[in-house]
């Protein structure tokens, strides 16, 4: 079968690799000059199978109001006349209940755990290296209130059989020795030891090279204009350099997916939520993290990537903008220097990317009302984490097979 994948980020490339392994004739189309040059370029670097939660959670509306007035706020909202933004916000607020949180977190953990297995198989089968470490994620709490609030996450982890460990201050320092200088600033943490870290850009490029060896064709520098549909069946893709005939098409365009799908009558509640990162060269390993630490106060991930520290986080709801705000950089610097001052921030690279967020936190994976048109998008902050499992699911569905995990609640049909 001739399959065209739209998007060469980590989702598109892992999907291409799995479909090629399944024997399909695969073409990947992207407007950039190479793979992983947009949202997958400099993300936080965490592969967090256990630290995997929807942003829509009980208490978030109240916290959001407080965050809007914080100097180092994890949330930035820039309201505008945008019906897509308003609709998305309303849908997200409707998911901020205990009942919806439990449902959404459970299915996210299901997909994330499947991705853990799939990533291990890809790594074993290809031998690719990407500054990976397998030392877990430490969710770090600065207040007793944060520690107490983690009970709902502990309950979900236990229910899904995900290993975890609740730590006191000394336990956190045992896991991350560099925190010893900041012991008075922390009260405890939640460790998910099966989590990993790695450079998503390096991984995606290395896997793209393996996909080429399997016969995948990458068409870079092409802007996708439209989808060709006849009689309810996908027929191809229209680009600025001509049409590409296809038996099946997988849309993996991240935040830009709904803009394309709207043209063929599919409503997809995915909206861009901008995140920022700093990549800092390490000058003092003793004051640098061993793995990933989530600073719960600022919602910032601090990750060790070889001889670099990647600091990523925040949520800016401002539409399709990639501008770099100095205040956001200051927040990232404040968090990392407060906990892990082992890098030279004067030489840091500052970046922003648009995360494709759904209102319930779960990605949209599966078939659509148009035969042969599939979606693999909306992974939010967890695209790197969920990529390999999502790719396996799509490969099975495109091939006409039953997926190895339950996918009934992952498709766009859940939104009505």
From Swiss-Prot:
For whether the record's keyword set contains Oxidoreductase, the answer is yes
Q: In which pathway does it act?
A: Amino-acid degradation; D-alanine degradation; NH(3) and pyruvate from D-alanine: step 1/1
Q: Name one GO cellular component term.
A: cytoplasm
Catalytic activity of the protein: a D-alpha-amino acid + A + H2O = a 2-oxocarboxylate + AH2 + NH4(+)
Q: Which GO terms describe its molecular function?
A: D-amino-acid dehydrogenase activity
Q: Identify which top EC class this enzyme belongs to.
A: oxidoreductase
Its EC number is 1.4.99.-
Q: Which residues are listed for FAD binding in this entry?
A: 3-17
**UniProt xrefs under PANTHER family:** D-AMINO ACID DEHYDROGENASE, SARCOSINE DEHYDROGENASE-RELATED
Identify its protein family: Belongs to the DadA oxidoreductase family.
Q: What is this protein called?
A: D-amino acid dehydrogenase
Q: Which organism is it from?
A: Rhizobium rhizogenes (strain K84 / ATCC BAA-868)
Organism placement in taxonomy? Bacteria, Pseudomonadati, Pseudomonadota, Alphaproteobacteria, Hyphomicrobiales
């Amino acid at each position: 079968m001739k399959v065209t994948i739209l998007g060469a980020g980590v989702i598109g490339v892992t999907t291409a690799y799995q479909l090629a392994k399944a024997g399909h004739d695969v073409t990947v189309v992207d407007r950039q000059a190479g793979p992983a040059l947009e949202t997958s370029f400099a993300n936080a670097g965490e592969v967090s199978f256990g630290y995997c939660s929807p942003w829509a959670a009980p208490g978030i509306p109240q916290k959001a109001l407080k965050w809007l007035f914080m100097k180092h706020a994890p949330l930035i909202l820039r309201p505008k006349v945008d019906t897509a933004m308003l609709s998305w916000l309303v849908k997200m607020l409707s998911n901020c209940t205990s009942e919806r949180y439990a449902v959404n977190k459970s299915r996210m953990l299901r997909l994330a755990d499947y991705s853990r297995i799939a990533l291990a198989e890809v790594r074993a089968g290809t031998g690719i290296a990407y500054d990976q470490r397998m030392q877990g994620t430490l969710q770090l709490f600065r207040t007793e209130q944060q520690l107490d609030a983690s009970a709902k996450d502990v309950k979900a982890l236990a229910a899904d059989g995900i290993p975890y460990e609740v730590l006191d201050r000394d336990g956190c320092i045992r896991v991350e020795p560099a925190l010893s200088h900041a012991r008075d600033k922390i009260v405890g943490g939640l460790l998910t030891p099966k989590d990993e870290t790695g450079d998503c850009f390096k991984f995606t490029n290395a896997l793209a090279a393996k996909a080429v060896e399997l016969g995948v064709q990458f068409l870079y520098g092409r802007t996708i204009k439209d989808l060709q549909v006849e009689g309810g069946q996908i027929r191809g893709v229209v680009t600025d350099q001509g049409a590409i005939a296809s038996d099946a098409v997988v849309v993996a365009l991240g935040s830009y997916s709904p803009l394309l799908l709207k043209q063929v009558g599919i409503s997809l509640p995915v909206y861009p939520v901008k995140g920022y990162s700093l990549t800092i060269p390490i000058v003092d390993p003793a004051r640098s993290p061993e793995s990933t630490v989530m600073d719960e106060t600022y919602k910032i991930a601090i990750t060790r990537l070889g001889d670099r520290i990647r600091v990523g986080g925040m949520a800016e709801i401002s539409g399709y903008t990639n501008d770099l705000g100095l205040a956001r950089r200051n927040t990232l610097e404040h968090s990392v220097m407060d906990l892990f001052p082992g890098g030279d921030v004067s030489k840091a690279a500052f970046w922003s990317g648009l995360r494709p967020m759904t209102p319930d936190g779960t990605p949209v994976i599966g078939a659509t009302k148009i035969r042969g048109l599939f979606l693999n998008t909306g992974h939010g902050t967890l695209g790197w984490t969920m990529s390999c499992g999502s790719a396996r699911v799509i490969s099975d569905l495109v091939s006409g097979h039953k997926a190895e995990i339950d996918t009934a609640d992952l498709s766009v049909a859940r939104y009505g």
